[in-house]
């Protein structure tokens, strides 16, 4: 029993346990199930080896809503027209369309910006910061800087750092009143 408990506990605490031996293999990042035949209300999205990846109507609605309202400024007009609900649309056309759009969404860089950093008594330094955000993954930030180190080194040694200001005690009205009362 002492030997079985750590093995059982490690299986229960794993992030993702392979449940293929039970027959409940999942697909489409856990939103779908691999089955021989899809139910009436489910749609086939991908293939799981010899089976079909079936997703329910809630997942299909979630994907459509995300593509329609979550990314309207990223996608071009042709894709937006295809996403509008149609009365005579078949499951095959929808599946091909959804799978063709996903690589476009992944390839777009949402968070790219370029800044200009200015250091006093030195030359300007151009820096570009690019960070990408992917759901469920760690965000990495890369910064590249370009400057002339000889010029900035010369300018840094040419001017000494400014001396700190001398400590001045500023007279306050209450201090002036006390001095006037003493006299």
From Swiss-Prot:
<comment type="function">
    <text>Has antibacterial activity.</text>
</comment>
<keyword id="KW-0211">Defensin</keyword>
<keyword id="KW-0929">Antimicrobial</keyword>
<dbReference type="GO" id="GO:0042742">
    <property type="term" value="P:defense response to bacterium"/>
</dbReference>
<keyword id="KW-0044">Antibiotic</keyword>
<feature type="disulfide bond">
    <location>
        <begin position="27"/>
        <end position="53"/>
    </location>
</feature>
<feature type="disulfide bond">
    <location>
        <begin position="34"/>
        <end position="48"/>
    </location>
</feature>
<feature type="signal peptide">
    <location>
        <begin position="1"/>
        <end position="19"/>
    </location>
</feature>
<dbReference type="GO" id="GO:0005576">
    <property type="term" value="C:extracellular region"/>
</dbReference>
<protein>
    <recommendedName>
        <fullName>Beta-defensin 129</fullName>
    </recommendedName>
</protein>
<feature type="region of interest" description="Disordered">
    <location>
        <begin position="142"/>
        <end position="183"/>
    </location>
</feature>
<keyword id="KW-0732">Signal</keyword>
<keyword id="KW-1015">Disulfide bond</keyword>
<feature type="compositionally biased region" description="Pro residues">
    <location>
        <begin position="159"/>
        <end position="170"/>
    </location>
</feature>
<keyword id="KW-0964">Secreted</keyword>
<feature type="disulfide bond">
    <location>
        <begin position="38"/>
        <end position="54"/>
    </location>
</feature>
<comment type="similarity">
    <text>Belongs to the beta-defensin family.</text>
</comment>
